Curated annotation (Swiss-Prot):
Similarity remark: Belongs to the chorismate synthase family.
Oligomeric and partner information: Homotetramer.
Species annotation: Leptospira interrogans serogroup Icterohaemorrhagiae serovar Lai (strain 56601)
Cofactor: FMNH2
EC number: 4.2.3.5
Pathway membership: Metabolic intermediate biosynthesis; chorismate biosynthesis; chorismate from D-erythrose 4-phosphate and phosphoenolpyruvate: step 7/7
Protein name: Chorismate synthase
HAMAP family: Chorismate_synth (MF_00300)
Amino acid sequence: MPSSWGKIFKVSTFGESHGTSVGVVVEGVPAGIPIRLEEIQKDLNRRRPGQSNLTTPRDETDTVRVVSGVFEGKTIGSPIALIVDNQNTISKDYENLRTTFRPSHADYTYQMKYGFRAHVGGGRSSVRETIGRVAAAAIARMILKDDLGIETIAWVDSIGTVQSNIGDKYPKSREEVDQNEVRCPDVGSADQMRSLILKMKEAGDSVGGTIQCVSYNLPPGLGDPVYDKLDGDLAKAILSIPACKGFEVGSGFSGTLLTGSSHNDEFYVEEGTGRVRTRTNHSGGLQGGISNGEELVIRAAFKPTSTIFKKQNTINLKGEETILEAKGRHDPCVLPRAVPIIEAVVNLVLIDAYLYQRAINPQWFQKWARIPDYYKDLEL
């Protein structure tokens, strides 16, 4: 079962929803980088269950432990292992799923692929797998910010039929996004979204939506042509998140409604800085699979949570039709907790692209990177 991502900044996650623990091993992190454990924990706290009545009531602290690769608060160049223990599992709630498949869940496909599966908590298909990604991405986020000034901010753009009205007035900070439990910076729309989620929760149903994400301060040159395009890597990473069913960059599907003369992003030289900029950003910051220096703008679509508390028709392991009445603790809407997960996988793609570009083109690194003091302190 593939569980790794990245060419240079390589992330390998492990663990199941109701196992002893979940975690990640991160390879390719340069030596000498300060690891701020509180920053990793802060990111995990944004993702953790039980944080509001809009999410699953499973109450996990998701406290992270660093077990290797860090000495006296700094990376030493060896693999970094981060572990989070599972503390609040109720496996008996899943006993009826040992031989019964939840509609639209990975139960059936995992069974068909492997012939055996961990039915409790969804096993490896659970969103708890993303704990490892979020923890690893916290390290990536620190490096990207320190070296390049890159900041990645995601937010809930829609829930069901309720659409936010922020347009292209993108939030500039996580604090702006986290001002409400929905994680939508448009407060009026957030109230409507909250009401819709609670309505679905009361009805034993679920609802989906979209998340938008912007990465600021990307330099031009990240990504590779043809098979390793940055948007291709982003698409693969985003669509690997549980419940994610759609992805677009920049104008995305709405760009098909425009003409070339309307959609093309015209270049100009910015006065004062001499930087090449574009007057519009329909491309979402990517052209030919390579960043052009504008904001990276993406959007992801999430389906309604597949585990609901309504009776559903399904089949069992013998191929017999039956009725499923699901138990357990589940999110009525994954969107509020998916925001930090989206940020995480975007940062994992960006850090890998950055370290690769830095390795193959030292002149690019010298031109665009802000070399932090901790690199200068290395005794070589």
